[in-house]
Every structure is written in structure tokens, then in C-alpha cells.
């Protein structure tokens, strides 16, 4: 390359010997074999000991997802996208192959209550003939002293033995199961949210739904004399359902507009019309407490208990605002100080992984983010994210919503139906699908809506409300420091600050100096938790010593890559973990997964899927014994290297095919035509020029 540059320089020299004699700089090719540790770190490369380095493979382009190792043979035909009806038909046909769960459990074809109408197979002999081979090892239920609930369909059937345990022990070890009656009420829009709706109405946040409420009250008044009790009740119920449904539809609509718009405010013209004709009720204007009370008395509408409580609270405010109890004064106390907090992780932060982290030393756990709209629709898959294991002694759930009404109703519903220690509202999610619905980090541009969400949610339940935010929506436009002093007054118990903006994602290191600044600006009654790039006990110690006011640190990607980070922090050491110890940790995850998702074929493959999602993070771990400089930083890109044994080398592979091979060591062979592609781009590293 330097010869080409020199030749070009000679050919273009036209100003004499002086310019032609200028030296031509040659670019020396960088080599990881010759570079010092300092030079490697400057390039954000891991300083691995020279004896463990190896030449890179011939082609790196194939390894982007390396699904070719596990995909079915490709053909030139383009696969046609299946319709929902076709997929539903295929699922129905597949269910006829699967053995009825009740028959599998009891081994009695007459035990199924649906008899011939059951959509599952009742032919035990036919099922045994086509059932896949058993997996080596012991049934996770039998190993725990329980009776396996999957019976004949268990993939570890050969290890079953007569045991006096109860197959319902799973329900004792897990809680927050979704009640079918609750689901039915949500499906039919008959669920009541007394506290949330009363608070929303007192603050004027019900919006257009108030028109329906007023119509409901007028209808009830008119029908009292013209209908008997049963007819009046039916009309009232139908009107209430219509009102709730209308409110949900209106509040869930994402109205396009500038990001600075905080709330939809009433037109002055509409307000004047309302003043002229008060009998029509509120048409979306924001009422204060006195006006609401006067309208109720003037129109003679029936006053509920919730409205009486609202009137009392309004009178207290008018008399002396200092007498009103702050929402935090009525709440249960929760202390995050110096507790190891496992972040709520989408997809990989499932119940089995949280159990694993509890074993390894985590103190606080939180469920995966659940969308408020899906919870209000009664989606069982969304409610499954709220499930809790008995070992999670300090557990919270994380929800995400766009508007005060949907969030507050979900908060009231969770407080009523689930056992949780705190409810976290995600106001920092960067995912496009969430942001486009004005939820997650989009709320950072709408501080008034943030206030309304926190204020209403914290005032209707005794369960502590926490929020999670980022520094800002746009890079370079931090704004949490200007809101942190108010967040505590809104009623939040704690706030978690991720030291990046939504625009940054993971392109730069977390800004801990800004987190410290926000922590010092916070009120004394608000606990501040820092989040971002905690990857060793030294990181934890540094953040705690640099800012003593910081309550705790939330650990996210660090726990995914090396879940034993909790052990390292508690024991204050770098754990040079062996490949055998890492395999045992994976075995624990598989055991927890089979107990949670089931030991039948469906449960095994579900466990395999989430194991592979987790392995797409763990390969980034570099063993301590292979590094020249410790501890490893989360943004270091490793050169091509090998481990101290074959298993360690396999675990550090970025090939999806190698991850599948690890899963086969724990869960047997994959089904024919098995495919896997990671959901998250976990192999992305920060670029050196981004710091």
C-alpha cells in the first residue's frame, strides 16, 4: 500500500526536487499480537494474553447469525406467508397429536371431563408410538420431591418413580396466577376501577369519558321512575361497560402532534357552552374540586362513596393543604439502599433466570415489562409476566403505558389481584413500537403527563410506586435533573436513572456524572438508583463511593453476561469461574425452566428457546484468567481467541450453531428443521470513537 502511495506521489510531483523528496508516510498494519495492553484498550479491544490468541477464521460474514448451522436445507422456493386462519388450523391439528394433559397425568382415558369433545388426543398407545425419545437425566419435579404433573408426556418419563408428593406444589412455589374470572371480566369490559376512576375524575383526567359518565347518571335518574329495579340495574351496567370501553378506546389512540404537547386541553368555546348549559355535564373540560362538587349537588346525581371521599379530600385542601396526607405517608415502606437490584429484562428476565440470580446473590428482582393495554385486555401471555416465585422475597412488576387512566387502572388491578412489593412504571423504554404509542421514553418529552401518571397511581394504592427513566429523549438535551426534585413530591418512592438518552441506546458509555448530579438534586425522601455498565464489584464500589447519596445500582446486561456478578459484589472478588462451574449454572437454569414451563415437549422447547436467548449474551464473557488487565469492561471487543479447555472455547463462540450444541448437552437433540435467531442484538459493542 505504501509503494502505491509513493508511486502516486512521484508521478504527481511538478514543483521540483524539493517537493518530490518529501517523505511518504507508510501505514503500519495493526496487529493484536504486537500491540500492548494500553493500545488494545484504546481501541476498546480486550487485552487477552498472547498465548490464548489465534488467527481469525477465514470468513466472518457468515457468523452474523450463523443460522445456517441449524436451519433446514434451503431451497430456491420462496415460502408463502401463512394467514392467521391457516396458522390456527395448524395449531388445532397439532393439538390432536398431543396427549390430553388430564389423561397424561392420570393415565386414564376416562378422566377427561370433555370426553369426545376434547381437542387433544386420548389414544395413549398411539401417543407413545410417536413420542420423542426421553432426555437423559432426572425429571426436575421428581428431583425436587414432587409428583410430576405431566405424567406420560414428560420427556423424563424413565426417571419417574412412585412418590408421595403433590403435583400441585408448583402453585405453592409460584404466585400471581391469572384468575379466569378476572380475565372474563376484562374480556367483557365489566371490570370496575373504583379508586382509579374516582381519582381521575377529581383531577379532571377522564377526558371525553366524562360525557358517557354524565349520560349514564342522567339515564339512571330518568329510569328510576319508569323501570323496575331489575331493568334499571341492567341499563346501568350496560352504560357503565360502554363508558369504560369508550374511555379505553379514546385514551389508547395515539394523537399525532408535536412532542411538546402535554395534554389535550378543552377549547374555550366548549367551556362557555358548558357554563351556559350545566345539565349536559362535563364534556372534557378540566374541573376543579369545587366545581365538581357544585355540579353534583345541583344536578342531583347519585353520589357514590368514592365521590364522598373525594369531596372530603377537596374540603381538606381548601381548609389547609398541610393537613392532607402525602401519598407516600400512606404507603408501605421499602428500602432499596445497598441492595443488589436485578433489572427488569425483556425476554431474558424471565422467572427461571430471576430464580437463578436469587441463588447467586441478587436482593431485588422485577418482572419483565408488561404493556398496560394488553393487561387491561386480559391477555394471558402478558399476565404471565407478573408471575412471582416464592424465593423472590423483594419483588416488583414493571408496567408501561401512555396515559394516566390506563396506567392507574392497571396499578389498581395489580394491587388487587397480585402479590408484589412495588410497581415500577417504565418511562425510559427506547423501543420504537413503545415510543410510537407515546409510552416509554416518549414520556420524557411530556413532563405534565409524567406527573399525572405518577400522581394518580401513587394515590390510589398502598403499594410503593417507582419509575424508571433515561437522561433524556434526545442526546445532549438532558432534562431529568430539572424534574428530579418534583418526582418525589408526585408520590414516587424511588426513581431509577439509566445514564443514557433514548437516542444513544448503547452507542456510548453511561453518564454516571449526570446520575450523581441528579441524585444530589433529589429530595431526601426519594431513593435514586443508578443504572448503566455495572460489570464488576469495582464498578459498584466506585459508584457508591463517588456518590454516597445513591441508594443502589441496578444491574442489567452485566447480569445477563455473567449472573455471578452478584456473588462477586457480595464477596468483593473477581471470580475466575471455570467452564464446568458455568455449565452447572446453566443446568440450574434448565431445571428452573422445566419446572416453570413444563417437562413435556412444549416445555422443553420453550426452555431451550430462552436458554439460547440467554446464551446470546453469555458468550461475551471473557474469563479472568485469560486477561492481562482486569476487570473486563462491558464495551471491550475480544480478538479471536480460545479458552483453557474445549468447553470454555465452545461457550465463548459467537456462532448460533455452537449455542444450539450447548443446549443439546442439556436438553437433548433439537427437533428436525429447528431454527433460531436472537431477538436482541446482544453482540453489538460500543465503538471506540464513541467512548
UniProtKB/Swiss-Prot annotation:
- Look up the record and name the cofactor or cofactors this protein needs: FMN
Enzyme Commission (EC) number: 1.3.1.89, 1.3.1.-
Q: Which GO terms describe its biological process?
A: mRNA processing
Keyword Lipid biosynthesis annotated: no
- Residues annotated to bind FMN: 344-346, 398, 468, 498, 531-533, 556-557
Q: Which GO terms describe its molecular function?
A: flavin adenine dinucleotide binding; mRNA dihydrouridine synthase activity; tRNA dihydrouridine synthase activity; zinc ion binding
Task: Specify where the region named Disordered lies, as residue ranges.
Answer: 55-94, 259-286
Task: Give the modified residues of type N-acetylserine.
Answer: 2
Q: Where are the zinc fingers (C3H1-type)?
A: 94-125, 138-163
User: What PROSITE patterns does this protein map onto?
Assistant: UPF0034, ZF_C3H1
Where does the record place the catalytic residues?
A: 429
| Catalysed transformations (reactions) | 5,6-dihydrouridine(47) in tRNA + NAD(+) = uridine(47) in tRNA + NADH + H(+); 5,6-dihydrouridine(47) in tRNA + NADP(+) = uridine(47) in tRNA + NADPH + H(+); a 5,6-dihydrouridine in mRNA + NAD(+) = a uridine in mRNA + NADH + H(+); a 5,6-dihydrouridine in mRNA + NADP(+) = a uridine in mRNA + NADPH + H(+)
User: What are the entry keywords?
Assistant: Acetylation, Flavoprotein, FMN, Metal-binding, mRNA processing, NAD, NADP, Oxidoreductase, Repeat, tRNA processing, Zinc, Zinc-finger
Q: What class of enzyme is it?
A: oxidoreductase
- Compositional bias, Basic and acidic residues, is annotated for 262-279
UniProt cross-references to CDD domains, sorted A to Z: DUS_like_FMN
InterPro entries, per database record: Aldolase_TIM, DUS-like_FMN-bd, tRNA_hU_synthase_CS, Znf_CCCH
List cellular component terms (GO). vacuole
What function does the entry list?
Catalyzes the synthesis of dihydrouridine, a modified base found in the D-loop of most tRNAs. Specifically modifies U47 in cytoplasmic tRNAs. Catalyzes the synthesis of dihydrouridine in some mRNAs, thereby affecting their translation.
**Protein family per UniProt:** Belongs to the Dus family. Dus3 subfamily.
Its protein name is tRNA-dihydrouridine(47) synthase [NAD(P)(+)]-like
Q: Which organism is it from?
A: Arabidopsis thaliana (Mouse-ear cress)
